[in-house]
């Protein structure tokens, strides 16, 4: 935020920070306390910084993806899919970041979870 509030290098006139949390930042549930704690901290940073950022014309938003399939989560992803659940893809998360950077209301966080329906991307603002 320090750089952005003094930067004039912004042709569109919009300054935006998107924080990546997790649904674990709201609901816990993974059983990995360090991960859950770090994601709760990101939600706290979002809540604590967006008011100060607005004073400088900076929008601070967040996204909170549900389970996302990556190389690190491949083993769990296989079990997830075997149970008939559809994990997010990195493309789903990337799209949510891009949308949040241009459409998000400061202080908002978007849950990103793929469900078995025609849209494949369900976003709920919390």
What is the predicted role of each segment?
Residues 1-12, 50-51:
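Amphipathic alpha-helical dimer-interface segment in Rossmann-like NAD(P)H-dependent oxidoreductases
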Residues 62, 78-126:
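C-terminal helical subdomain
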Residues 1, 46-47, 94-97:
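Short-chain dehydrogenase/reductase
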Residues 28-32:
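Active-site "substrate specificity/gating" loop of NAD(P)-dependent dehydrogenases
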Residues 27, 48-58, 67:
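Active-site-adjacent segment of SDR/Rossmann-fold oxidoreductases
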Residues 64-75:
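Short, flexible catalytic-loop segment of classical short-chain dehydrogenase/reductase
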Residues 38:
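Active-site helix of classical SDR
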Residues 22:
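Residue(s) in the substrate-gating loop at a strand-loop-helix junction
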């Amino acid at each position: 935020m320090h750089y952005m509030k003094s930067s004039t290098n912004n042709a569109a006139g919009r300054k935006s920070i998107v924080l990546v949390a997790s649904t674990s930042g709201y609901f816990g549930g993974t059983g990995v306390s360090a991960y859950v704690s770090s994601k709760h901290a990101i939600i706290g940073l979002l809540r604590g910084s967006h008011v100060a950022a607005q004073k400088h014309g900076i929008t601070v938003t967040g996204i909170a993806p549900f389970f996302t399939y990556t190389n690190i989560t491949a083993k769990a992803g296989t079990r997830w899919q075997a149970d008939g659940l559809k994990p997010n893809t990195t493309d789903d998360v990337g799209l949510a970041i891009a949308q949040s950077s241009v459409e998000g209301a400061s202080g908002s966080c978007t849950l990103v979870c793929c469900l078995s329906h025609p849209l494949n991307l369900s976003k709920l603002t919390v």
